[in-house]
Amino acid sequence: MDFLRILLFVLACIMALFTSAIAGGCIQRYGKCSTENSNCCAPSECYFSFNQCF
C-alpha cells in the first residue's frame, strides 16, 4: 500500500469511531458545541475546527 491509501484508511477509522460515539446529537466523550443540549458544551469551550469540546 502506498502512503495515501494508508492515510485514507486511518482517517476512515477515526471517522467511524467518532460517528459510533454520537448519542443524543452530541459526542459522548467530549460533547459537541451547542447550547441547546445539556450534554453539549457552550460555544466558548469549543475546539472549533472539530466543533467539539476538549
UniProtKB/Swiss-Prot annotation:
Which positions form S-S bridges?
26-41, 33-46, 40-53
Keyword Disulfide bond recorded: yes
* Keyword RNA-binding carried by entry: no
Chief place of localization: secreted
Q: Write the signal peptide boundaries.
A: 1-23
Keywords attached to this entry: Calcium channel impairing toxin, Disulfide bond, Ion channel impairing toxin, Knottin, Neurotoxin, Secreted, Signal, Toxin, Voltage-gated calcium channel impairing toxin
Cellular component terms per the entry's GO annotation: extracellular region
Tissues expressing the protein: Expressed by the venom gland.
| Subcellular location(s) of the protein | Secreted
Any GO MF annotation of the entry: calcium channel regulator activity
What does the entry's free-text domain comment contain? The presence of a 'disulfide through disulfide knot' structurally defines this protein as a knottin.
Report the family membership. Answer: Belongs to the venom Ptu1-like knottin family.
Please give the function described in this protein's UniProt entry: Binds reversibly and blocks P/Q-type voltage-gated calcium channels (Cav).
Q: What is this protein called?
A: U-reduvitoxin-Pr7a
